[in-house]
Structures are given as structure tokens and as C-alpha cells.
């Protein structure tokens, strides 16, 4: 389809691009006085800076292909935009609201506002968006538009110190303001203003004003006659007409033909102008068009604008267009050949390390790349594909360090405590040393939040001298994030595994899958199933990424996963992992971490010196036990930071910290180094302040007092801790000094670690045959069943111990577990419930320093439980000295640190009879 011709009846046609190119609405033509002008109505996005492109008047024509991946059909759509012609024959197009007046009446002499252009002159026939920051100028432009005289003069700024700026964006935004001359007599100001701009410019019509952006359409040449006013700069101008010339002159014709021939070479390299018909342009229009689309500098273009001899103007344009042809040829060579050469160098460099099946694919794609033109969309796709293939670290491995002593030192530096976890990691490294490699193992670090799972993974990588890459899979629901997108999708990319190898630059990094228990799942696939191929040692040697479509070797990668709850990990995935539990930190470990790490780090981060504040050990202990009982130390760090922020505010209010004695009014006179400020006396500081700000005597006295004031060291202990962190979050768990009849202390495991739990029983009513049990406390099904079993076992034991006691047969009982708002479940309270029932039946108190835990069977056997470490910590926190554990948990308790076991009287039982003796026969 050939470009349509336009008549000169004043119609204009707006070509609207698809919605995703909706920021640009191009006006195909603006006709006036048998001329066609380029125009635009649009809102320029922030990424497009007007006036900086070598072809600034065409920037918005080029913007779609620069900012988006247009295909050929899109370029064809925009290519059929205008016929730059003064012919009136052709087909009438549908009219829209005309930008230009259909019947303009312009005098040869006009008074217009002069707008300075910093980067390039406005060539007649082209449009140019500019930014106007000056409110007076902007208001004047809007007023001229309302009065049906939307014309201004556009003049190129001369090169001078007052307008040059190191920041191009600053020049664009403030060029009108910088153009002003201040502090000189009126006559000199006017003369200097006129000397700053070229006298020959362009009469421009205001196409639209949107905010601070004004779109100008070049109309004709003009020259400044005189200045009318300064603010805004208004000048009287005259139109410049081309000198007469002979169209039949052979020399002019030859220049015209040569310009057309050369210009067509330029148009071929620009997909937006490739279909432009320039054969029917007039001589002067052809010269202007060639200069406008060339990448010439502003001085060359100003020369074309100033030249009124059409033949000389054609010669100037021919010079510019020839230079543009040479530039385009060099650019084609650089963009096409150099890109191909880079790919070839990469392939040849790594050829010995790249697998043969990958080399075959690379060669096929490289051959295809050499046959494609750079402007084709397939060129970018092929280059991108080869780029990813060639940047992967084929055969590049980092040296693995299996020094166990070094690894232990690194783990101790990064983490305090966690001795069992460190020991397990050292075992893993030792096995790797004997085997010569650590591949084939997948470690899963399981534990509550804040215990250091992610940082341990990073420490393992540092100990092994492997590169580290963290991939958070929490909430991940798209398989393509792992295995990549197919190349047929727009914006396709490789998966995270390929991106990881590219990022770290080695083929044997340590990849950490963070929060693997929180994987999502949706219609796009199951990421957990995709991870099976990634982490399975039998499959990941030939891992297939959908984007690359070639197999890559992940068998040398060491995978480490982190999870809070391993039960949430799919079974097949969990089966491939070796789980290491991080149960958390005990109080002693938290104290060391807080004192040796967290407090020091927070001091540095808050800019507080150690001599400014004293945080006592008692305050830290109270903070740990009453505010931060969770297994990790993340919340403990937050609370310490909260304390030191308040301390910082208090110190600043006291004037204890140094302040910056500077003032923006005179930065040179106040510039002092830190050491100089420290050596300065108060009087010297006051002199500087007085000279810079002119403060009154009263103000100087106050500031002197502020600097000279001595500060009081902030003391924080258990008594005033609440002033910094608020009231305690956790109350003391021990409710009773001596538990009453029917009340027994049990031990429970929670996500916060461990806690004590009271089991309370009382009777509701008594009467012959009214025996029964009512349960409250938001208990789960397992715990309710455990209560029923405990009730039955207690009746049996009571019948054996005291056959005449009919308490259970004639009493309706109510069992309650306090903190009813907290859901509770689990079987480990069975023995505690039995003891509570028996205490009520015998009306006998249970030993006051006793806590117990253990699941009970219907025959009275005690079964093992979990969370021995956490429950032991909870017992110590409540000053419990005697603990009853199931016999099967003896080994778990013996593995605990000595400081945790110290001072405890622990009994291990396998049947309830032993618990009965410990709980009720304490007198003996």
C-alpha cells in the first residue's frame, strides 16, 4: 500500500497506535498554505527526554522502536504516515480536530514570544516538544493559544557560559530561567539577551500545551528585528523568503538528484522512514527534510536554517546526508558484525568445555544469526538465545575447601551456640573431604523463624569456598520461574537455575532454596514437582531449561533448603533431603548473642558510643524472658534497636552528641572536618554561628549552653526497661507457689519454644451415678481423647489404691487448661491429666516443684514425646527443679548441654505407677 497524498484544504489526520503504544498519537499531516507539516499530540513518558537526541525532532517517531519490541507490521503502520509534499492532488482523508488554523492570516511582521532552544534548531516542517518551567512564559503561551494566535519564535541558543550546563536535564528544564539576565541596566540586558540567541529562527505554531510541555510545529523562517519586552522575552520578527532560483538549472537539478539518491540510502536504514516517498518534494523542502532527519549537530542544522540560497542549502544538506550514510554504515558494521563477532569469540573460547550437543545448537543458531538483518525481530531473539548459552560457566568450577578446622572457625564466627547443628555440618564436610566432593546431598535446615537458617547456609558456602545464591521460593506458584519460559512467549527468559549459574559464574555454587515449605501451586503447574528434577542427583545432571532447550549439568551444585515446618514439604521432595533441626537458642545463648553481637551492632548502627549508655545484664535477661521468648533472636534484635533509638533521642535532647556546625548560606566558611570540630572551643563555634546566621545574643547563649552541657550516662536496668520497650508481653508462667488440689503443672512445646501448662480439675456436682467429664480450654481432638483416656486410667488406679473411694463414679468433673484463647493439642499431657484427677479424688496436693510430660496409654504405659529441649528450658524458666520425662526420652535429655541440665532432678519413667510415687509420696 502506497502512502496517501494529501490535499491542501486544511485537513489533518490523526493516526492512533494500539493501546499499548497509547502514549503516542501521531498527526499524519498539517497542511497550511500548500505546505505539509509534521505534528503530534501526545503525553511524553518520563523516560523520553526531548531535545537530547541527535534527531530530536523525530524522537517520538523513533521512540516506539527504541522502547518496545515492535514487529514489522507495527513499523509499516507507522511508516505510512505522511507525504512531505506541496501537491494538492490525491485522496481526501477523514478530518479530525485540526491542529493548525485552516485559514491562517499571518502578516510579514509579527510580535511573538521568543523561546530559546538549547540543543537543536526547529526545522520548518518538523515538530519539537519542549519543557517550559517559567510560569510567566507558560501563561503567555496559553494566553496566545486562547486568542487564536498560537505562534512563537524558536531560536537556537548560542554556545556561552551562561547556558552551558554540566547537567543536560537541568538545561532542558530551566533553559528559560537561565536565559534571563539580571542585575544590569535595561539597555545592556536587552543587548545581551539578543546576543545569546541566533537571530534567524523558526516561526512555530503551538500544537498543544500539556502541563509544562509545549509541542511546537515549525512553520517558516524568520529573523529578529527588535526586542519588545524582556519577561517574557518578546521580539518583533520578519519572515525570511528563499532567494529566487531556476528550477531548470542543470547544476541545481544535479544537486537535487544527488540529495534524493543519498537520502534514500539514509531512509533504507531507518525502518520508520523506509517507505517515505521523497520524489515529489520541492527543492527547499527536500533540503529541510534531509537536514531534519540527519544526525548533524546544532551548528550544521542552524547553517541550513540560515541559508536562503536554495542551491547552497541543498549542498549543505548533501554534506550532512552523506555523513549520515557513512555513520549508518559504521553503525551497521558495529551492531551486526561486532555482535556476531562477540558471540563467535565466546563460542571459540569455551569450545573445549562446552558439551558437544550444546556446541551443535550454538553453531546452528550462529549461522542463523549471520543471515539475519539487525532490524529484524528474529535477530534480537537469536542473539539473546546465544548470549545466554555463551555466558553460562561451562566447565568453570570453584575450588572446594574441605578444611574442617577452618569451617568450624567460620561457623563459630557467624553463629553462637547451635553446637549440635555445627557438628552435623562438620560431619557433612568431613564426608565430602573423604569422597573428594560434597555433591549428591541436599540439606534441609528446619526450625522456627529467626534462628539463623539462611545465615547458616551462607556460612556453609563460605566454609566450602563456594559461590552463594539465594532463591526465595516462598509463595512461588509458576514452574517457569524454575524451568524458564518457552521461547515462543513474549519476554521469555531462562529459569532461576540458569540465571543463578550466570550470576555466580561457576558451575558448582551453593544454592539456597529459602522457605521451601511455603511453595505455592496454581494452574501454571506445581513448583514442588519441578524441584524434584532440580534436586534429584539422578536427574539434575541433565536438567532441561525450557528457554535454552538444551540439557545443563546441575549435579555439581550443592542444594540447601530452609523450612519452618517440614510437614508442609511434599513427601517426595522431603524424601530427597537430609533434615537438620535448629530448635533455637536457650536463654544463656541469647544472652551471649545479645551482649556480644546485637548490642554492639546496634550501637554502631545508631551512632551511640559505649560510654553513652549502660544496658545491664538484668535488663537483657528480662528482655529475653518477658518480651522475646521465641526460639530465634530476630525479635530480640528489634527490641534492642527500639531501646537504642530511644536512647539516641534522649542523648540528642541532652546535647551529648556532636552536631554539624554548617550552614547552607556559606558552606565554604563553615567547612570543617570532624577532628577540627572536636578541637574547636565553644567560643569559636559561636563566632562561626554568629557570622553565618546572625543569631541574637540570647540565641548564642542558648547554643553555647547546648554545646557545653555535660550529659548523664543513660542507665537501663530491669526497673526502667518498661520505659523503653513497654509493658512485658509475657507474664510469669508460674501462677501458684503451691498448686492446689486438682492442679498439676505440665510441660508443652510451642512455636515460641517451650512453656509450662497447668491442668486444672474440679468437681461440678456429686450424686449417686452422676460420674462424668466436661472438658474446656480450646483443646484439639487428640488432647480431648487424651483426657478421656486419663479419666479412665485414673478411675482404674483409684479403684486399685482405694477401692472404697467412689469419687469418680459419683462426681461430675470439669477439666480445664488455662489460656483458653490459645488452641492446644497433642497427647503429651496424658500423665499430667491423670495426676490432676487423682489429686482431686484423694484431696491431696501434688509436689510443688514438680512438672511432668508424657503420653499415656489405656494400660498406664508412658510413651515418648517431642521437644525435650524446649520443655526443659520452660521448666528452668519457672524455677522447677523436678521434671518427669518418659524413659524413651532419656537419650534426648542426655544430649543437652550441661548448663541446661545443671541443678535439675530429672526422673525417667515408663509406667504411671512411678509418677504416682513421685507426685504424692514426696513426704517419704
Curated annotation (Swiss-Prot):
| SMART domains (UniProt xref) | AAA, LON
Is Secreted one of the keywords? no
Q: Might you give the EC number(s) for this enzyme?
A: 3.4.21.53
Which keywords does UniProt give here? Answer: ATP-binding, DNA-binding, Hydrolase, Mitochondrion, Nucleotide-binding, Protease, Serine protease, Transit peptide
Alphabetical list of Pfam families matching this protein: AAA, Lon_C, Lon_lid, LON_substr_bdg
Enzyme class at the top of the EC tree: hydrolase
What residue stretches are annotated with the Lon N-terminal domain? 112-325
Per UniProt, ATP binds at 447-454
Question: Is ATP-binding included in the keywords of this UniProt record?
Answer: yes
Where this protein primarily resides, as one coarse class? mitochondrion
PROSITE patterns per the UniProt record, alphabetical: LON_N (PS51787), LON_PROTEOLYTIC (PS51786), LON_SER (PS01046)
Q: Which residues form the active site?
A: 828, 871
Compartment list? Mitochondrion matrix
Write out the GO biological process terms: cellular response to oxidative stress; chaperone-mediated protein complex assembly; oxidation-dependent protein catabolic process; protein quality control for misfolded or incompletely synthesized proteins
Catalysed reactions, semicolon-separated? Hydrolysis of proteins in presence of ATP
A GO CC annotation recorded here is: mitochondrion
Binding partners and assembly:
Homohexamer or homoheptamer. Organized in a ring with a central cavity.
Which protein family is it in?
Belongs to the peptidase S16 family.
Task: Supply the name of the protein.
Answer: Lon protease homolog 3, mitochondrial
The species this protein belongs to is Arabidopsis thaliana
